[in-house]
Amino acid sequence: MKEFVFYNPTQIVFGENQTKNIGRYLKGKKCLFLYGGGSIKQNGIYDKVVESLKKYNVLFVEKSGIKPNPVLSFVYEATELANKENIDCILAVGGGSVIDSAKAIAAGFYYDGDVWDFFIDKAQIKQALPIYVVLTLSATASEMNSGAVITNEKTKQKFNIRGDALFPKISILDPTNTYTVPKNQVANGSVDAIVHLLEGYFTKQYPNTPIQDGFVETLVKTIISSTNQILEEPQNYDARANFMWSATLALNGLTTAGIGAYAFPNHMMGHSLSALYDIAHGSTLSVVFPAWLKYNKDKLAQRLQRFGKEVFGIDNQTRAIEKLEDFFASIGAPTKLKDVGLSQSDIEAVAQNAVSLAQKWGLNEYTKDKIASILKFAL
């Protein structure tokens, strides 16, 4: 195991009916209440949150309309509103898009320049508004990490930020809040969580990490089984709970602590698909990841052999890739470029867009030609 420092200050409050307690943690504060397209008003979560805020005399200003691929223009608008209203914290009620937007707004609140400076490494995040979360969609683990991803609509760049100040203070994880999540969003969340786990698993440089390998394999198996249960029984509490906590653990730093250097090449390519064509994040990964595995099949032969055996009970690296791709397809996730409306003629534009993020992330071996070659496996 490699040396590491594990730091994660987010307090998790997990369980049924915990949403009603959010006001207790915000007592005496004035918060910016963020949410997405309004589904929380249809499923009752909005009413629970507002009732709790009023019970504990929490002042709040609402801002809704966050898109599945959150955009910079919203961050600008909401940051201006937060300053105007003298906000002292942010409450994000939603999934990764809402939480990521909250983090960008929190970072921009105290910064005199353009918040995009943080995304292009022109400035470092030194201070941010405190963030509180009521999770309604399991996928990104943004509820328990310090990262955020935002799309700049003008430059067509989907970039990320990270900083200790962006860890949420408290995140409420109530599995019942996910009972009404549509099947396509369940599928996207499942893919996202699995790829979060497997990027490190397949790209790590240090070989002897049995604890981390076991974590990843168990979590992937749990996500697969709970996803299948959820699609059959949307209100199966245990399935929702297992899925929710697995997705959080997939990117809260625990599974990668001690594995040494690792990378996220599939997220890099997926971000370009989202930036250019506004494709859901999970859908980009279900297309790109099997293609990346096929491209690297020989290089990853030993890892694929173990993955196939431990996760699917098979002893064949090609079949291991096929089984994962088959699972993605079985839950309704796209696995080919044509499934998201793209063809070979789009590959060059995606590869060109991805190069800048590859360079930002230090993935210099991912040239335009290499990225294009990988994407051809998704035709």
Can you say where each PLM-predicted feature lies in the sequence?
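Active-site segments that bind and position negatively charged phosphate/pyrophosphate groups
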Residues: 204-323
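Short Gly/Thr/Asp-enriched flexible loops that form oxyanion-binding sites at enzyme active sites
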Residues: 79, 98-112, 144-145
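A glycine/threonine-rich phosphate-anchoring loop and its flanking beta-alpha core
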Residues: 111-208
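ATP/NTP phosphate-donor binding region
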Residues: 1-89, 337
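Short alpha-helical scaffolding segments that buttress acidic/His motifs in well-ordered protein cores
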Residues: 194-198, 240-251, 289, 324, ...
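Residues at alpha-helix caps and immediate loop-helix transition turns in enzyme cores, especially N-
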Residues: 44-46, 74, 101, 303, ...
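C-terminal charged capping/lid subdomain of soluble metabolic enzymes
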Residues: 304, 310-379
